[in-house]
Amino acid sequence: MAHRHYAVLLFSRASNISPEDPEQDYYIHHYTYVTDKGTDALNYYASSMADHAELIDADTLDELNIEIQRTIDTVTAPDYIIDHLLN
């Protein structure tokens, strides 16, 4: 029986790391937690103190790696924080 694979991606707001230009805020990816246990992933996600977290899953590790990169690219895009946080 195949297991699903899970990842929790943690992001910080750039303004929290270096508050030089808060008008140009965006997310920085800083950690990815990968597991094959759904409850562990959910607990890690729920207890995260990150500014932003994403919980994703896939059938295989290869598919998960693709989704991880796609999520990082989406969340770290300059307009993401404007579209999803400020509106």
Spell out what each predicted region is.
Residues 23-37, 50-60:
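A short, exposed loop/beta-hairpin motif centered on an aromatic-Gly-Thr core
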Residues 4-14:
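A short beta-strand micro-motif
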Residues 14-21, 63:
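Short, surface-exposed beta-strand/loop "edge" segments at domain boundaries and coil↔beta transitions
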Residues 2-4, 50:
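A short, compositionally biased
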Residues 43-87:
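Short, mixed-charge low-complexity intrinsically disordered segments
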